[in-house]
């Protein structure tokens, strides 16, 4: 009987451990891989939207269409110009904010938007603390590996005035790390 109890406890413990594992999304770009840890407890809608798009291949072949040195790199627009993209629900979704998750460091992953409750498919990665964005953009993850790739991308030449990279910065493939 004791062996059965130990076996059940061990099984339950392993199940809880498996469920506690972080979801990591990999953006395999033309200059290297960026690994992003998701924040599902902070922003469940944004994480569901992003990871579902990843699983469906939505981001494959899309460009980082806007790069502002010292601020952020932005992607996720199928039009490639900052005017397109939609959520998995085919309509914008609400913002998700947490008082303890703020733009206080570089390498945060957040939803790009055009105002309150306008989240779609576009996202950005910060390159510095950007406190003025608190309460305006949903943070739903962070870069955990490939920060050097993000910094390389930050330093590519861009067109003056519109911050479009002179050479395409492409997400060759986005996928969930196993």
Predicted feature descriptions by range:
Residues 1-6, 109:
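Bacterial N-terminal signal peptides that target proteins for export
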Residues 5-14:
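Sec-dependent N-terminal signal peptides
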Residues 13-178:
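Cyclophilin-like peptidyl-prolyl cis-trans isomerases
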């Amino acid at each position: 009987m004791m062996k059965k109890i130990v076996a059940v406890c061990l099984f339950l413990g392993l199940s809880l451990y498996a469920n506690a594992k972080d979801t990591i999304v990999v953006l395999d770009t033309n200059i290297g891989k960026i690994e992003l840890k998701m924040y599902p407890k902070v922003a469940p809608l944004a994480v569901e939207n992003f990871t579902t798009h990843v699983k469906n291949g939505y981001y494959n072949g899309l460009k980082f269409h806007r790069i502002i040195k010292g601020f952020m790199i932005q992607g996720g627009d199928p039009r490639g110009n900052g005017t397109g993209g939609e959520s998995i629900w085919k309509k914008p979704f609400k913002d998700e904010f947490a008082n303890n998750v703020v733009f206080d460091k570089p390498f945060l992953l957040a939803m790009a938007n055009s105002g309150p409750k306008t989240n779609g498919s576009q996202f950005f990665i910060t390159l510095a603390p950007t406190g003025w964005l608190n309460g305006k953009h949903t943070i739903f993850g962070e870069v955990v590996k490939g920060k050097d790739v993000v910094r390389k991308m930050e330093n590519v030449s861009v067109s003056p005035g519109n911050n479009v990279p002179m050479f395409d910065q492409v997400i060759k493939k986005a996928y969930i790390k196993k």
